[in-house]
Amino acid sequence: MTKEEVEEEPLSPMARLFQSPGIENCIITMIGFKAKINPDIILDDLKHNVSKHPRFCSKLVIATHTNYDGERWMKTKVNVEDHVFVPDIDLQEINKDGDGFVDDYVSRLTLSPLDKSKPLWDIHILNVKTSDAEAVGVMRCHHSLADGMSLMSLLVACTRKTSNLESFPTIPAIKRREQMMSHRFGNKGWYSRSINAVYYAVRLIWNTIVDLLLLWATSLFFKDTETPISEGIGSGNNARRFYHRTVSLDDIKLIKNAMKMTINDVLLGVTQDALSRYLNQRYGDKNGEGVTTTSNLNNLPGKIRIRAGVAVNLRQDIGIQPLEDMLAKDSKCRWGNYDSLVFVPFSISLETDPLVPLLKAKSIMDRKKHSLVAPMHYSIIEFIINTFGTKVFNRTCSNTTTILSNIVGPVEEVSLHGNCITYIALTGYGHSQALMIHFISYANKMIITIAVDPAVIPDPHNICDEMEKSLKAMKDTLSGKSD
């Protein structure tokens, strides 16, 4: 054993979950650039910096010689050339269809497992022009290394402001809403404050109990309705395809401020409305009606149960964090997987008023925020994995329809080694659902990325179309009311 291969660390419970058979989740980050990528610059940077990040210079080993039998992280020497791939691209062969080439290339990655004999990440440099970039960099890493927020903090640490290439990107301070709730009744008398505090506590306990019972039922038998976006789902090992769309973050903020809600509420409302209309189209096609997405004909069944697992960041400090703080020992904004899932029911129906889905989404999320199910779900997972193993959790996600995630990205345009980034699209594969939706804010943009099982959802661009239409209808309705 070499000197570099002496430090071992057991996997965290969440890392063990992501490594378990039948899950094997990986995160893919696609980054568009305004100019071609120089592979030599990327390789040189990795040689100097990869050793600073413990998970990116550690491989997975099975330890049987210590007090802990099982998988562990072992620090090892990294040969970066083994992790960076630059495929030869015949521009005549792809016939200027750069988007199709990138889509096919990344889809093939989902069928190629990461090599566990070395650190679980790789980078693919695709110097091909697409509709929104001159080149695309694809980073793939196993979910056991980190969650999306950790990876975003790592990416931001590697970039500089495009407006000033000597300056690090701005890292905005984001406070949890819960931290401000103590001031909610500050101007009222002690009696009113006491009554409200008791009512608040009772609601919190009740909501938590109900959510825990629903979580338990979901892990055992409580399934979503089989719909065109979930029927015939096979294994999480099936090939996945990815599609992204860029919309205006300013439009989302306009709706957020006008409706007095959060960005997450707006995104949930847009997704709920878009999936309703997409499902209406799919049911129409299935019934032979041949409806278009603009049709008012309601083809939806009477009752549909669709739930989304919404990712919740459990760190005390949310948003992008300085990388050195995340890597520090006992950090409150620690590196790794420190998030949970809250299962949110969707109201699937065709609404004539574009604002109704927003109000429904806000009502649902307000109740979920007034519950301790997210941190308790995380603690329960840790306890059961440490006690019984990981198999029990395979069913919880497979009994729901989709997963949603929203990650805060750079607040201004940034560059990597002087090459301006046009978009950041983060997604994943290995999950059992046929649909996963990620949102990432970048400067004044919101990038929507959809991961699908093409055997179940052959037209993911139609979902993005419906999301754009929903967002525009909501904005136009609010603009009309303000005139």
From Swiss-Prot:
GO cellular component, one term: plasma membrane
Enzyme class name: transferase
Transmembrane segments: 204-222
Topological domain spans for side Lumenal: 223-483
Entry's induction text: Induced in roots during drought and salt stresses.
EC number(s) stated in the UniProt entry for this protein: 2.3.1.20, 2.3.1.75
Molecular function GO labels: diacylglycerol O-acyltransferase activity; long-chain-alcohol O-fatty-acyltransferase activity; O-acyltransferase activity
Cross-referenced InterPro entries: O-acyltransferase_WSD1-like, O-acyltransferase_WSD1_C, O-acyltransferase_WSD1_N
Record flagged with keyword Nucleotide-binding: no
First-listed, main subcellular location of the protein, grouped into a coarse class: membrane
Tissue expression summary: Mostly expressed in roots.
Pfam families: WS_DGAT_C, WS_DGAT_cat
Chain's role: Bifunctional wax ester synthase/diacylglycerol acyltransferase. Involved in cuticular wax biosynthesis.
The name this protein goes by in its record: Wax ester synthase/diacylglycerol acyltransferase 10
Lineage, opening ranks: Eukaryota, Viridiplantae, Streptophyta, Embryophyta, Tracheophyta
Name of the gene encoding the protein in the UniProt record: WSD10
